[in-house]
Amino acid sequence: MSLSTLKREQIKKDLKDQEFDVVIIGGGITGAGIALDASERGMKVALVEMQDFAQGTSSRSTKLVHGGLRYLKQLQVGVVAETGRERAIVYENGPHVTTPERMLLPMHKGGSMGKFTTSIGLAMYDRLAGVKKAERKTMLNAKETLEKEPLVKKAGLKGGGSYVEYRTDDARLTIEVMKRAEEKGAKVINHTKSVHFTYDSNEKVNGIQVEDQISNETYPIKAKKVINASGPWVDEVRSGDYARNNKQLRLTKGVHIVIDQSKFPLGQAVYFDTEKDGRMIFAIPREGKAYVGTTDTFYDNNKTSPLANQEDRDYLIDAINYMFPDVNVADEDIESSWAGVRPLILEEGKDPSEISRKDEVWEGKSGLLTIAGGKLTGYRHMALEIVDLLSKRLKSEFGLKFDKCATKHLTISGGDVGGSANFDKFIEQKVEEAKSYQIDESTARHFASKYGSNAEELFKIAQTAQYQETGLPLDIYTELVYSIQNEMVYRPTDFFIRRTGKLYFKIDDVLNYKEQVIDVMAGLLGYTNIEKEAYTKELQIAIDEAQTGNHQPAVKE
């Protein structure tokens, strides 16, 4: 067992009893990356997350490990080069959560992308991002473009470009990084909120006071250094520190909608112009659905649950019907949706899409280190930068010496599959192995492709599972038990949203099996009646919010 919910009390005891080199506030991809880098260098690491891991921005993205093509349009050449390098590393270290996918870029008369400039742009992108030969761009005429995706608007079509993006499961990427950090010695816990900082006699930060959001217990965590990696909450967290700088975040909201392929039979991922504002958005097929996004609007409301409002849904439906006019989707065709908040660094006078996605590290007089901004793709490099600085400070202030960054070739949990080139072969081997556990081929394939080298753990659970009396199918029961024992799942929403993505891509499973899942969790985790009622209600609210056009203004009223 690694990140086991069943070991929660022991983890809390370790957090109370030990002094750490660093405690990290925030369990999204940024915090997870820092925990992995620091623990791999030999540092004693603690991490707390007030909600579930990846519950903020890190489960609400476009679910792409970008190569950074959009930054080329803004002539951010260095960003494209670094993003391309990092994308290759992310893929190599975790091919079970990252998949190369051909993206079609249709070009229309009067659109933002001309054929000549697109060809040059994609060629530059291939070079800067270090794209593998087999994945380099190809230019297409109108006929070839329609062969790739017949639903694309024919009127004014000049041709298209085809290039490769990498599709990911952002929340699973985060949890796999977190699990590897724990294997390297980090003590990590979710549903635990940092309430305030503690200071030594020289007014230097020397830890945090936390509150368990499940039991309401409060306790201190002692650490030589504190890193604030709380994403959209960065400003709130450091407002509790007396020594903050005058920089601040500007939040923008991005919304995605999900439509069944029976209504929107998209065969190919497409990156396309919108009619209204000239922005570009994605339409991506996944697991029998097509998801479309994203919007980009300023946001200053509830950060814990940003919602897709009717205006967001209308914008995306209009965009689909503009680029795919034969489809005729309507609001009632939306099965599910999600909204995320981007924690960008404020740049006065810029539109949401113009604000840089770069990250910055801020150091307060108290010694508090804060990391702000950044992108999913760059998580490893962001961690490298801040842990280099942390290492420097631990040496100068405490005389401690640590190794250099060693995450470039470090697989994440589940990533020990013999490299990305071997992943397909690995899956076939696992499917064969599963026969000895009496597991059918499609279940075995699902476990192997989703959990990588951890698949055998699921095979073992499935082999002895007494699942029939629970009313759950074998795959859902197995994943539920695995996620409680290894991925710190405590609430039904943790399981249905962030460990499995079912609320977005298989909402029927949530609707059909929610009561049975809650019953199994109540039995395994010892829910009180009050907890069971609260978590049932919380899940129903999440379902309602995903399915409907919510009234949520951009700014609190």
From Swiss-Prot:
Enzyme class, broadest EC rank: oxidoreductase
Keyword Flavoprotein: yes
Biological source species: Staphylococcus saprophyticus subsp. saprophyticus (strain ATCC 15305 / DSM 20229 / NCIMB 8711 / NCTC 7292 / S-41)
Catalyzed reactions: a quinone + sn-glycerol 3-phosphate = dihydroxyacetone phosphate + a quinol
Main location: cytoplasm
GO cellular component, one term: cytoplasm
Sorted UniProt keywords: Cytoplasm, FAD, Flavoprotein, Glycerol metabolism, Oxidoreductase
Stored Pfam families: DAO, DAO_C
Assigned protein family: Belongs to the FAD-dependent glycerol-3-phosphate dehydrogenase family.
InterPro entries: DAO_C (IPR031656), DAO_C_sf (IPR038299), FAD-dep_OxRdtase (IPR006076), FAD/NAD-bd_sf (IPR036188), G3P_DH_FAD-dep (IPR000447)
Protein name (record): Aerobic glycerol-3-phosphate dehydrogenase
Organism domain of life: Bacteria
Pathway noted in the entry: Polyol metabolism; glycerol degradation via glycerol kinase pathway; glycerone phosphate from sn-glycerol 3-phosphate (aerobic route): step 1/1
